[in-house]
Amino acid sequence: MKSASLSYEQNFYVNGTGLSGVQSINGSYGIPERPINILGHGYVNHILDGPLQGDFTISRVLINQDAMLNMTGENAAFSGVVSYNTYGSSNTGSFGFYSGYLTSYKLSCDVGSLPEVSTDISVYGDIGPNLVSASELAGKDSDSAVDNTINPPNQGSMTIYCDELNTASNRIVALNHEIACQREAIYALPTSASDAQAKYPVQVDLVYPLEQTTSLSLEIDDYQTKNLYDYLTGVYTGNVNIDINGSSNDATLASFHLDNARLVSESFSSSVGGVATVNMTFKKYINKRR
């Protein structure tokens, strides 16, 4: 593939540290503009019709401790960049962002496969090339820039606990967990004609409560579903705990403990030649700590 940038020639960094296990990256921006039309002529010009904003989505296999999980709270903005080389050339290009905030963290896991993580990022700063210095890209292969700790989990190092389930007779075969982190950007009017900072938000707030959603897929033997109308006299609540450790030691790669999570949906399915399965969905809301 002449003049193509192949996947093994690409690296992704968050705040200067490389991420391992990245499977795909998608970054984009759109410019909201509105045409100016005048009577008797039509279009004459255009104006900006909203704040400038971009989006990034990063999908990766969970093979070590996930630094992106720490971005779900009230953390400062972070930057990220994809660096790439053109095949057969020493030229280096980049596509990155700064002032990004994580808005969604999704974990999925099935029997026989490694856990996968997908993160959505809203960008309120600039997006494009040349957003990192040449010296930063020059050190991309250094020990400080590359995450060399590979410690993937296996099925024996992952534990899932649910108050409602007897996991000895009802087998969990898949799980999905999502943390939604809605952000609200606050903009201010410029104080002078040369106030360049007016194009960026003065602050970005985390909107509470945070919503956590956990879905479990079960192959059942003796599990009994709940009655729909029992919700009217008291929704079922229980604890759901997910712990994922590395296979070579007890290092925690990801951990989610949902105390008093609310059971909000169940579905039952069965087919010829298959087994009876139930899908359960729990929700948990997290308020701001006072």
Which residues fall in each region the model found?
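Signature of extracytoplasmic/envelope-associated structural regions
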Residues: M1-R290
